[in-house]
Regions:
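Non-ligating segments of multi-cofactor redox enzymes
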Residues: 1-253, 258-261, 265-287
Length: 287
């Protein structure tokens, strides 16, 4: 029998203990705050590890790291980025293409803790979804952004990009960007479940495309143990990606959809240990 959304993870907590039912969540938060700390170490302590922001930065003032979407906007607008920016975009593209799927979204993005909190509160207080929007709208928005950059000759998305706004706000103090971040929080809390990360964000859409053939993946390797509690579906930002691997015994157990954020919450909250984070070449992930 399916559990209530507000009870998602309770069985896992009772059966596996706190650490094993929160392990991947804790590791993600540590990674997110570690990256943020590398940005903050310069302005706060004068030790520049990551110099810049989430759109473009230098690691130890040497290794460039550039958001691929910003680079595509620059190319679409007719402006060839500097060699260092192109190099940074290549580094990030290769890194996430090899690693897999939307690891940036769940392990690096500073907005992820905000949207996770909104959706935890939504489950906790049994708030019903008040609107429905198609998940493919993020890909439409991605195309619109590139067309808009081509037509205006500007990096049109960077005017309102909440990921870079969040990063700058944390480094330089919250200003008008805080209103946009608050709006996204309320949107996820009151309007559409997992609305930003699961439906709209064009940054996540691009990383999903780039990492669709990457190494790291989630697999329902022991799906025969599934008791249909549905906790994994309740906590997953992209629950549609679990449908075939978990419920269709004729489908491969590997979560192959590029929408998967590889966040590991399905692994955490499953009391029967159905899921594992593995590689796409693992024999268990292919079965």
């Amino acid at each position: 029998m399916a559990n209530r959304k507000r009870d998602a993870g309770r069985e896992a907590l009772e059966k596996k203990g706190w650490w094993r039912s929160h392990r991947w969540l804790v590791l993600r938060r540590l990674c997110q705050f570690f990256v943020l700390g590398m940005f903050l170490s310069g302005p706060w302590f004068g030790v520049w590890i990551l110099h810049g922001n989430y759109s473009s930065s230098l690691l130890f003032d040497t290794v460039p790291l550039t958001d691929p979407l910003m680079t595509l906007q620059s190319l679409a607008s007719g402006h060839l980025p500097a060699t260092v920016a192109l190099t940074g975009a290549v580094i990030i593209t290769v890194l996430y293409a090899l690693a897999g799927k939307r690891l940036f979204c769940s392990w690096v993005c500073p907005l992820n803790p905000i949207t996770d909190l909104a959706n935890w509160l939504r489950r906790r207080f049994d708030l019903n979804q008040s609107a429905t929007i198609p998940r493919h709208i993020r890909y439409v928005l991605l195309v619109v952004i590139l067309l808009g950059s081509a037509l205006t000759g500007t990096l049109i998305w960077e005017w309102i990009n909440p990921v870079s706004l969040m990063g700058r706000s944390l480094v330089m103090g919250f200003g008008s960007g805080a209103l946009l971040i608050l709006a996204l929080f309320l949107f996820d809390l009151l309007v559409v479940e997992h609305g930003w990360c699961g439906h709209i964000c064009p940054v996540g859409a691009l990383y999903g495309v780039l990492g669709s053939k990457g190494v790291i993946t989630v697999a329902a390797t022991d799906r025969q143990k599934c008791n249909r509690c549905m906790d994994c579906f309740h906590v997953c930002p992209e629950p549609h990606v679990l449908r075939a691997p978990v419920l269709d015994e004729q489908s491969p157990v590997q979560v192959s959809s590029r929408d998967c954020m590889t966040c590991g919450r399905c692994v955490d909250v499953c009391s029967e240990d159905v899921f594992t984070i593995t590689t796409r070449w693992s024999s268990g992930a292919k079965s």
